[in-house]
Amino acid sequence: MPSRPDKNLETFPNPTQERDYHIHMEIPEFTCLCPKTGQPDFATLILDYIPDKKCVELKSLKLYIWSFRDENAFHEAVTNRIVDDLATALQPRYLRLTAKFYVRGGIFTTVVAEHRHSGWTPLPSVDLFHFDSQPSTRG
């Protein structure tokens, strides 16, 4: 496998397709270039997805992310492009990318973009921190 930037996203079969489960990744080394100034823009990407048939292979994701370091891109455009590329490669049930860009001109920018597979409905959320372990039906 190459160890230089690469736009190819590799996948592998989801080992548990019968269950909705959440994959969370934090990618603190994203870099692209500001199309106005040519200066580097840095961001932490937070990727959350619920796979369907495929999962993303981590090294290919790293090389894909590196491939943006010499590209001119507005924050909004690059965030949505990454979502589109991941959605095309993975065809997930749900995917959300949060791009938290470092300060530029005194402004922090966060861009959030989502993809939802048509027809997919999330299961009800379970919040164990607020789970009532002593419901009123018990004495």
UniProtKB/Swiss-Prot annotation:
It comes from the Bacteria. It comes from Nitrosospira multiformis (strain ATCC 25196 / NCIMB 11849 / C 71). Belongs to the GTP cyclohydrolase I family. QueF type 1 subfamily. Substrate binds at V56, E57, L58, H75, E76. Gene3D superfamilies: 3.30.1130.10. Its main location: cytoplasm. GO terms for cellular component: cytoplasm. The active site is at C34, D41. It catalyses: 7-aminomethyl-7-carbaguanine + 2 NADP(+) = 7-cyano-7-deazaguanine + 2 NADPH + 3 H(+). This is NADPH-dependent 7-cyano-7-deazaguanine reductase. Pathway: tRNA modification; tRNA-queuosine biosynthesis. It holds the Pfam family QueF. Its EC number is 1.7.1.13.
